[in-house]
Swiss-Prot record:
<dbReference type="InterPro" id="IPR026906">
    <property type="entry name" value="LRR_5"/>
</dbReference>
<keyword id="KW-0433">Leucine-rich repeat</keyword>
<keyword id="KW-0812">Transmembrane</keyword>
<comment type="function">
    <text>Renders cells highly sensitive to the activation by cytokines and lipopolysaccharide (LPS).</text>
</comment>
<keyword id="KW-0732">Signal</keyword>
<feature type="repeat" description="LRR 9">
    <location>
        <begin position="253"/>
        <end position="274"/>
    </location>
</feature>
<feature type="repeat" description="LRR 11">
    <location>
        <begin position="301"/>
        <end position="322"/>
    </location>
</feature>
<feature type="domain" description="LRRNT">
    <location>
        <begin position="32"/>
        <end position="60"/>
    </location>
</feature>
<feature type="repeat" description="LRR 4">
    <location>
        <begin position="133"/>
        <end position="154"/>
    </location>
</feature>
<dbReference type="GO" id="GO:0060760">
    <property type="term" value="P:positive regulation of response to cytokine stimulus"/>
</dbReference>
<feature type="glycosylation site" description="N-linked (GlcNAc...) asparagine">
    <location>
        <position position="400"/>
    </location>
</feature>
<feature type="transmembrane region" description="Helical">
    <location>
        <begin position="527"/>
        <end position="547"/>
    </location>
</feature>
<protein>
    <recommendedName>
        <fullName>Leucine-rich repeat-containing protein 70</fullName>
    </recommendedName>
</protein>
<feature type="repeat" description="LRR 10">
    <location>
        <begin position="277"/>
        <end position="298"/>
    </location>
</feature>
<feature type="signal peptide">
    <location>
        <begin position="1"/>
        <end position="31"/>
    </location>
</feature>
<dbReference type="InterPro" id="IPR000483">
    <property type="entry name" value="Cys-rich_flank_reg_C"/>
</dbReference>
<dbReference type="InterPro" id="IPR050328">
    <property type="entry name" value="Dev_Immune_Receptor"/>
</dbReference>
């Protein structure tokens, strides 16, 4: 455009434009520290560089700052200046010993602050000043032993606070004053012995509280009373031992209660009073022995109940009566149950899953009622006999009456019954009964001498019925018989049958045939169950393989569109402000023990063009 005569003005214009462009790019080009691995202006990665202090001259447009894995002992108020757009600051695993008050005062748009896995021993008031928009604060795996009152005063927007695995022993009055937006509080794996009655003041919006693995000896019911919105409470791994009356008063919205491995031996009558909306209760790994009608009488909406790995030996018939319409899952495995009356389970009309394995079941007549109830129920429950030894390992559903009642009749015990003043027999009747035993009984094969005795309950044996029929006809003519031992040279085994006297040869042959048929049917049933199990496993394997193939195809299809999954995207969205939010409580039963860190969601709000452009980002590990 410029000729030779205008070369000097053109040169001046060129220099002016160049200087202007350099000024515009100054913050992007010259603002990044040369020691950092990645500096895009939006994201700065200074991970694992052994830095002893925070570098200077970061661009003001920085959104992510990664300082993980360094050797930064102290953070003062002059090190994090000018970062007005910073959203996430990672200072974890950096050997931090102390953070000075007002160290984050200029980070007014900070949403996520990671100070976990350091050596911070104390938190002084003013340390979080200026963090009015902070949502998530991570302080786990430090050495904090005490939190002074008011230290969290400035965190009015924090919804998630993680203080697990510190050295806290006492939560004093007003520890969390000012945290009116807090929804999740994790205090697990500390040494907390006592919680002040006003320790949770201002936490009316708290939804999830994790106090597992501390040293609480009783439920701090007075401290819980202010937590009107609490939905999930974990007290597992505390030496509580007993649930005192009204331990959970005020927690009307509580739905999930974890009391695993808390040495609980007793639940008082009103122990669960006030939590009528409870849905999930976990009492695994405790020392409960007896369950009665008062234990769970107030939990009318309970859906999920785990009682495995206790020492339960008895359950009253009406223990689960009030939760019959709601309870769907019940776990009674790994206890000391030997019998269970069907009336215990009959009220549970909504039950879909029952576990009772690994109990020392005694397969006798007491379990026949349970077997019959299970046969008519839609619930699948595998109970295997532990006693008697002859039935060990056999499934309850294969046990029938012939296996349950088989006994020998001993004459010596019959004489003990005869000795009773209420029972008298004619000598003639006794001899007739003895003649019937020796003539119509089982073949006499053994020539050894032994004592033959009868059951105590004479009416249940044919010989006893014979005595009664002949002895009580004319009680005035009866003669008392002295109890003496009768020595016989044969052993007599009398099998009890329902509608017959002592078996004759024909009855004996019929009984043997019936027993053989029963055993064959049992073997066929067992074989069928084994084949059915293999078939189900094969179907599951086929479905799993199909699922994996479909998943693999989806991955291949996704890889065609993008070679690499990225968590952050740049320069694809118009100027806007994006609000970062996180889901509060995961309600999956599998996540009850510890709070999972939820995936972050972003909601876009359009702003005028003259405001600073903020990138859209996703972060799956916050």
């Amino acid at each position: 455009m410029c000729g030779l005569q205008f070369s000097l003005p053109c040169l001046r214009l060129f220099l002016v434009v160049t200087c202007y462009l350099l000024l515009l790019l100054h913050k992007e080009i010259l603002g990044c520290s040369s020691v950092c691995q990645l500096c895009t202006g939006r994201q700065i990665n200074c991970r694992n560089l052994g830095l002893s202090s925070i570098p200077k001259n970061f661009p003001e447009s920085t959104v992510f700052l990664y300082l993980t894995g360094n050797n930064i002992s102290y953070i003062n108020e002059s090190e994090l200046t000018g970062l007005h757009s910073l959203v996430a600051l990672y200072l974890d695993n950096s050997n931090i010993l102390y953070v000075y008050p007002k160290a984050f005062v200029q980070l007014r748009h900070l949403y996520f602050l990671f100070l976990n896995n350091n050596f911070i021993k104390r938190l002084d008031p003013g340390i979080f000043k200026g963090l009015l928009n902070l949502r998530n604060l991570y302080l786990q795996y430090n050495q904090v032993s005490f939190v002074p009152r008011g230290v969290f005063n400035d965190l009015v927007s924090v919804q998630y606070l993680n203080l697990q695995r510190n050295r806290l022993t006492v939560l004093g009055s007003g520890t969390f004053v000012g945290m009116v937006a807090l929804r999740i509080l994790d205090l697990s794996n500390n040494n907390i012995l006592r919680i002040s009655e006003s320790g949770f003041q201002h936490l009316e919006n708290l939804a999830c509280l994790y106090l597992g693995s501390n040293n609480l000896t009783k439920v701090p019911s007075n401290a819980f009373e202010v937590l009107k919105s609490l939905r999930r409470l974990s007290l597992s791994h505390n030496p509580i031992e007993a649930i005192q009356p009204f331990a959970f008063k005020g927690l009307a919205n509580l739905e999930y209660l974890l009391l695993k491995n808390s040495r609980i031996r007793n639940v008082t009558r009103d122990g669960f009073s006030g939590i009528n909306n409870l849905k999930h209760l976990i009492l695994s790994h405790n020392d409960l022995e007896n369950l009665n009608s008062d234990t769970f009488s107030l939990l009318k909406n309970l859906i999920y109940l785990k009682l495995d790995r206790n020492r339960i030996i008895s359950i009253d018939n009406d223990t689960f009566e009030n939760m019959g319409a709601s309870l769907k899952i019940l776990n009674l495995s790994f206890n000391n149950l030997t019998a269970l009356h069907p009336r215990v389970l009959k009220p549970l009309s909504s039950l879909i899953h029952l576990q009772a394995n690994s109990n020392p079941w005694e397969c006798n007549c007491k379990l026949l009622g349970l077997r019959d109830w299970l046969a008519s129920s839609a619930i699948t429950l595998n109970i295997y006999c532990q006693n008697p030894p002859s039935m060990r390992g056999r499934a309850l559903r294969y046990i029938n009456i012939t296996n349950c009642v088989t006994s020998s009749i001993n004459v010596s015990r019959a004489w003990a019954v005869v000795k009773s003043p209420h029972i008298h027999h004619k000598t003639t009747a006794l001899m007739m009964a003895w003649h019937k035993v020796t003539t119509n009984g089982s073949p006499l094969e053994n020539t050894e001498t032994e004592n033959i005795t009868f059951w105590e309950r004479i009416p249940t044996s044919p010989a006893g019925r014979f005595f009664q029929e002949n002895a009580f006809g004319n009680p005035l003519e009866t003669t008392a018989v002295l109890p003496v031992q009768i020595q016989l040279t044969t052993s007599v085994t009398l099998n009890l049958e329902k509608n017959s006297a002592l078996p004759n040869d024909a009855a004996s042959m019929s009984g043997k045939t019936s027993l053989i048929c029963t055993q064959e049917v049992e073997k066929l049933n067992e074989a069928f169950d084994i084949l059915l199990a293999f078939f189900i496993l094969a179907c599951v394997l086929i479905i799993f393989l199909i699922y994996k193939v479909v998943q693999f195809k989806q991955k291949l299809k996704a890889s065609e569109n993008s070679r690499e999954n990225r968590l952050e995207y740049y320069s694809f969205y118009q100027s806007a402000r994006y609000n970062v939010t996180a889901s509060i409580c995961n309600t999956s039963p599998n996540s009850l023990e510890s709070p999972g860190l939820e995936q972050i969601r972003l909601h876009k709000q359009i702003v005028p063009e003259n405001e600073a452009q903020v990138i859209l980002f996703e972060h799956s590990a916050l």
